[in-house]
Amino acid sequence: MQEFNPANVPAHVAIIMDGNGRWANARGLPRTMGHRKGVEAVRGAVRTAAEIGIRYLTLFAFSSENWNRPENEVSDLMGLLKAFIRRDLADLHRENVRIRVIGDRSNLSGDILPLLIEAEETTIANTGITVVIAFNYGARDELARAMRRLAGEVAAGRLRPEEITAERISSTIDTAGIPDPDLIIRTSGEERLSNFLLWQGAYSELLFIPDLWPDFTRETFFAAIEQYACRERRFGGLTQPTLAVGS
């Protein structure tokens, strides 16, 4: 088994899981089959991240724009998420995985919200890897919701405008308490962030890989961490560049 120096492993990796539909189309299969295969890749990614020593793994599961997809595809995606939680929650809990969910919950209906809450509450005391599920998530919406909360605090006299700092914003958005991602990976060869972690990813390393998400394997993940290891992270500075991992 390949090993990384724990001091050199990114604490937080976020993944835009792209390419399920194209994977299915290339094989003459319904798009829903691509999503089902993608769930298998999720299971593997969680195991591999824990094996590597990553502390936080954020997965872009369903964007706030995905509601615009065909109704049958949205329904299948909802069904897959619910099935994943029902089938895998006990195993994840047993493996000391903590689940957190980010995104707008205000308009979620049916049985999906109770399941998301159950996943969080069941694993809240776990101390292993934290898997952050970005569901009904969009970065612009996240910031708008945070700004409304802060504006309400100002209007109520509990907060002065000059107290709205970058730190205050970070503690108000959905990922409060979670470190910013060190590495953001997008599969399928597309090279854009698609409204994902725009605030948190200000200094993240970006890695765009050609593999479609269902083809994302343990070896793919290890190769991504190796590439991260070769990068220099300056965080906007000009002096004393720091390698992503020790030399």
From Swiss-Prot:
- Give the source's domain of life in one word: Bacteria
Q: Which family does it belong to?
A: Belongs to the UPP synthase family.
Q: Which InterPro entries match?
A: UPP_synth-like (IPR001441), UPP_synth-like_CS (IPR018520), UPP_synth-like_sf (IPR036424)
Tell me the Gene Ontology biological-process terms attached to this UniProt entry.
Answer: polyprenol biosynthetic process
Question: Which of this chain's residues are annotated to bind substrate?
Answer: 19-23, 31, 35, 63-65, 67, 69, 186, 192-194
Q: What Gene Ontology molecular function terms does this protein carry?
A: ditrans,polycis-undecaprenyl-diphosphate synthase [(2E,6E)-farnesyl-diphosphate specific] activity; magnesium ion binding
Q: Which residues form the active site?
A: 18, 66
Protein purpose: Catalyzes the condensation of isopentenyl diphosphate (IPP) with allylic pyrophosphates generating different type of terpenoids.
Record text on cofactor binding: Binds 2 magnesium ions per subunit.
**Cellular compartments per GO CC:** cytosol
Source organism (scientific name): Rhizobium meliloti (strain 1021)
For this protein, the Enzyme Commission number is 2.5.1.-
The record lists Mg(2+) as bound by: 18, 205
Group of enzyme by EC = transferase
Cofactor(s) required, per the database record? Mg(2+)
* Name assigned to this protein: Isoprenyl transferase
Under the heading PANTHER family, the entry gives: DEHYDRODOLICHYL DIPHOSPHATE SYNTHASE 2, DEHYDRODOLICHYL DIPHOSPHATE SYNTHASE FAMILY MEMBER
Q: Which UniProt keywords apply?
A: Magnesium, Metal-binding, Transferase
Keyword field contains Transmembrane: no
Q: Which Pfam families match?
A: Prenyltransf
User: According to the entry, what is the taxonomic lineage of the organism?
Assistant: Bacteria, Pseudomonadati, Pseudomonadota, Alphaproteobacteria, Hyphomicrobiales
**Subunit record text:** Homodimer.
